[in-house]
């Protein structure tokens, strides 16, 4: 454990600290210096992978246009007829009886989680899992995409307010003498309890049925930093939303992976706001990944898109690839998932455009980042961990030095990386990145076999001193209160 010197402690705590405070400080320091190890990668010990989750198989079927997707070790189509894929996404109509309201207010499966039999839902969900994931040894990504309501009452705003309105009506219809205050309280409690049970038991069933699969909910966690057009936009997650994410510990404890999303807007193209938006969303997910009852950090797979939210067929610029995919890799994500819908395959022209992008800017950048992550893992972490930024907010990336490497593209869209890292390249990596060791390994370079009662993960860098100080001071003040 790394211990602060007496002088450093004086910078943090300037008043006398009681014995109980010192004990709390000890445990805080121990928890920081012993971060949870990373779960072993799902594919050939690759520290960072790119997954493909778009229906581009239709390009071959409809237009005889084949995309070279060899750079994606994990591939799946979101189409309903697709089965047995190593990326399986469950929309509302593919997993049990998810309750929701249409935009016209028509209830589907009861509309509210309070109105549906959980047992009946789970029985149908079990059938759906067996249909869409027939292999019992499935070890891919299992993503549940349920977006109509959120399990926390306070987060059901705007169009989702219908779930609060209907929950209130459900309570008021039960008795005429219930006060407005009681209606609000009971509506909130019954909705949240039902929503929690619905989501928790569903993912529990998935993990029980396919225990090797990386089960998680799409868009969880969310940072809710969508005010990207605000003056002086920082990208940071609002404090209330961070606290609400903390309250979802039951969801993180139930999950096997996290699937945040960083879809961005063309109207912000190449701007610092896209970088800020992505950076804080991924960082929040990395924070949540260590807050569970698991003895390892949950793997984070970041959903992104080929194009922009406001212009889906206008594909990401080179800078925005860095601000999304590059940020995800540098912050320690296990991979990215590139999602697309049927618009990508609506015409031969669209398919051709996708093929050109994959075989040029996108493919080249993915080859660059994934190889750089491998090089860093091999040389800094002995292939027993992945590299993450020492300072999470620093502008450092897992990129190959063009003076040392060359990326060649073949005519059919396959990429080959040639070259070798120089001593200077490795020194730069060592200065800017540290190792997040996989389960079973520890030490600065992850060479040591983890002992039963030892620590593993990331050792705090000198730049973490301010964070340590703030935590120490906060703990002292809380005890004094």
UniProtKB/Swiss-Prot annotation:
A molecular function annotated in GO for this UniProt entry is: hyalurononglucosaminidase activity
Q: Name one GO biological process term.
A: hyaluronan catabolic process
Is the Glycosyltransferase keyword given for this protein? Answer: no
What EC numbers are recorded for this enzyme?
3.2.1.35
Gene3D superfamilies according to UniProt: Aldolase class I (3.20.20.70)
- Alphabetical list of SUPFAM superfamilies matching this protein: (Trans)glycosidases
> What is the pH dependence described in this protein's record?
Optimum pH is 4.5-5 (for chondroitin sulfate hydrolase activity).
Q: Tell me which residues this entry annotates as catalytic.
A: 147
- Give the superkingdom in one word: Eukaryota
| Class of enzymatic activity (EC top level) | hydrolase
Q: Which reaction does it catalyse?
A: Random hydrolysis of (1->4)-linkages between N-acetyl-beta-D-glucosamine and D-glucuronate residues in hyaluronate
Disulphide bonds annotated for this chain are: 59-351, 223-237, 376-387, 381-435, 437-446
Expressing tissues: Detected in placenta and skeletal muscle.
Its subcellular locations are: Membrane
The membrane topology of this protein is: Multi-pass membrane protein
Extracellular topological intervals: 30-453
Record field: temperature dependence: Optimum temperature is 37 degrees Celsius.
Hydrolase among the record's keywords? yes
Residues with attached carbohydrate: 86, 115, 177, 343
User: Its family?
Assistant: Belongs to the glycosyl hydrolase 56 family.
Protein task = Endo-hyaluronidase that degrades hyaluronan to smaller oligosaccharide fragments. Also has chondroitin sulfate hydrolase activity, The best substrate being the galactosaminidic linkage in the sequence of a trisulfated tetrasaccharide.
Give the protein name, as stated in the record: Hyaluronidase-4
């Amino acid at each position: 454990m790394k211990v602060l010197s007496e002088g450093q402690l004086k910078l943090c705590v300037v008043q006398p600290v009681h014995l109980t405070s010192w004990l709390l400080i000890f445990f805080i320091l121990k928890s920081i210096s012993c971060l949870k190890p990373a779960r072993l990668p799902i594919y050939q010990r690759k520290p960072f992978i790119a997954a493909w989750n778009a229906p581009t198989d239709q390009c071959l079927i409809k237009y005889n246009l084949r995309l070279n997707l060899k750079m994606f070790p994990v591939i799946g189509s979101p189409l309903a007829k697709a089965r047995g894929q190593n990326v399986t996404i469950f929309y509302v109509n593919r997993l049990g009886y998810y309750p929701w309201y249409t935009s016209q207010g028509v209830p589907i499966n009861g509309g509210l989680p309070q109105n549906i039999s959980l047992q009946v839902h789970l029985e149908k969900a079990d059938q759906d899992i067996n249909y869409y994931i027939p292999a019992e040894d499935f070890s891919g990504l299992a993503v549940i995409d349920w977006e109509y309501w959120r399990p926390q009452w306070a987060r059901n705003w705007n169009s989702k307010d219908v779930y609060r309105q209907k929950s209130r009506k459900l309570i008021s219809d039960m008795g005429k003498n219930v006060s407005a205050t009681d209606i609000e309280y009971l509506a909130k409690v019954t909705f949240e309890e039902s929503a929690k049970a619905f989501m928790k038991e569903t993912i529990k069933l998935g993990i029980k049925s396919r225990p090797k699969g990386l089960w998680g909910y799409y868009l969880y966690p969310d940072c809710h930093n969508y005010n990207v057009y605000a003056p002086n936009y920082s990208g940071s997650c609002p404090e209330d939303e961070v606290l609400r994410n903390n309250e979802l510990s039951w969801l993180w404890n139930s999950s096997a992976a996290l699937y945040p999303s960083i879809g961005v807007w063309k109207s912000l193209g190449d701007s610092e706001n896209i970088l800020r938006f992505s950076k804080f969303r991924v960082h929040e997910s990395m924070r949540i990944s260590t807050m569970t009852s698991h003895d390892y950090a949950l793997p984070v797979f970041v959903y992104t898109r080929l194009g922009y939210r406001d212009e889906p067929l206008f594909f990401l610029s080179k800078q925005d690839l860095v601000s999304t995919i590059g940020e995800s890799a540098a912050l320690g994500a296990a991979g990215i998932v590139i999602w697309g819908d049927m618009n990508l395959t609506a015409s031969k022209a669209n398919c051709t455009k996708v093929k050109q992008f994959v075989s040029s800017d996108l493919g080249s950048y993915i080859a660059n980042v994934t190889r750089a992550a491998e090089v860093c893992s091999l040389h800094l972490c002995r292939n027993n961990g992945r590299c993450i930024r020492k300072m999470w907010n620093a502008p450092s990336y897992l990129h190959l030095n063009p003076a040392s490497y060359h990326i060649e593209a073949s005519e059919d869209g396959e990429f080959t990386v040639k070259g070798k890292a120089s001593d200077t390249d490795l020194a730069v990596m060592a200065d800017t990145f540290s190792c997040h060791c996989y389960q079973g390994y520890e030490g600065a370079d992850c060479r040591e076999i983890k002992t039963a009662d030892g620590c593993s993960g990331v050792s705090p860098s000198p730049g973490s001193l301010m964070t340590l100080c703030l935590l120490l001071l906060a703990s002292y003040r809380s005890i004094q209160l």
